[in-house]
C-alpha cells in the first residue's frame, strides 16, 4: 500500500458531511486500528467565493469590545516552515478586520494556541459565511497573495507544518 510506505501506521479516516438548511457540518474521525501510538495531523481546506469588499470576523465574543489583537505567524518562504520566533499582531476593531488587497501578501495568517474558535466573512455588516473551529489548535486564513482573488480560505487545523528549524521526530510535533 502506497500510504504505508510514507506513513507507517494502521488507521481509518472517515469524513462525514451533513447538510441541514444553510448549515454544513463536517466531521473527521481518525481511528487507530493498530497497536502502536498513532501520530497524525489533519486540516481542512475550505475555500469560499466572496465579493470584492468584505470583513473577516473572529470569535463572536470579541464583538463590541473595541480594539483587540490576535497573534499570528507566517510561513517562511525560504524554508516553508512556520516562523514562530517572530509572531505578529493583527489589530481588530469589534472582532473584525476589513479585507485589503495587501492582507495576504505574505501568505496565510496562521493563528495558533486555539485563539480562534470561530472565523467568518461579513459583507455589508451581515454574516456571509462562518466557520466554527472550537478546539482546533490552529486556524489558517488566506487568499492568493498579491492578487484580488475571488475567494478566501478559512482552514481549521489539528497540526500544521513544522516550525523553522524543527528536525525532531513525528511524535514530537
State what each model feature region is.
Residues 23-30, 55-60, 64-67, 139-140, ...:
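Short, well-ordered strand-loop elements centered on a beta-strand within folded domains, enriched
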Residues 2, 32, 121-125, 145:
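Short acidic, glycine-rich loop/turn motifs
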Residues 16-18, 120, 132, 173:
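Generic structural detector for well-ordered beta-strands
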Residues 18-23, 50-52, 124, 145-149:
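A short, structured loop/turn motif at beta-sheet edges
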Residues 5-8, 35-41, 51, 67-71, ...:
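A short, polar/proline- and glycine-enriched secondary-structure boundary/capping micro-motif
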Residues 2-40, 44-46:
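Acidic, contiguous internal or C-terminal segments within carbohydrate-active enzymes
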Residues 127-173:
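Active-site pocket scaffolds in enzymes
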Residues 37-39, 47-134:
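Active-site/ligand-binding surface loops and adjacent short beta/alpha elements
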Amino acid at each position: 500500500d502506497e500510504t504505508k510506505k510514507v506513513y507507517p501506521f494502521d488507521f481509518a479516516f472517515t469524513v462525514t458531511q451533513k447538510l441541514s438548511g444553510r448549515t454544513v457540518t463536517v466531521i473527521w474521525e481518525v481511528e487507530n486500528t493498530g497497536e502502536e501510538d498513532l501520530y497524525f495531523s489533519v486540516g481542512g481546506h475550505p475555500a469560499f467565493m466572496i465579493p470584492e469588499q468584505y470583513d473577516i470576523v473572529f470569535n463572536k465574543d470579541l464583538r463590541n469590545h473595541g480594539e483587540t489583537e490576535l497573534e499570528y505567524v507566517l510561513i517562511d518562504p525560504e524554508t516553508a516552515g512556520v516562523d514562530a520566533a517572530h509572531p505578529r499582531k493583527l489589530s481588530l476593531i469589534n472582532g473584525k478586520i476589513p479585507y485589503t488587497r495587501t492582507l495576504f501578501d505574505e501568505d496565510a495568517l496562521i493563528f495558533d494556541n486555539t485563539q480562534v474558535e470561530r472565523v467568518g466573512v461579513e459583507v455589508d455588516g451581515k454574516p456571509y459565511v462562518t466557520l466554527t473551529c472550537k478546539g482546533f489548535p490552529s486556524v489558517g486564513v488566506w487568499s492568493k497573495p498579491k492578487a484580488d482573488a475571488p475567494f478566501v480560505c478559512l482552514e481549521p487545523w489539528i497540526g500544521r507544518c513544522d516550525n523553522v528549524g524543527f528536525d525532531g521526530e513525528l511524535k514530537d510535533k
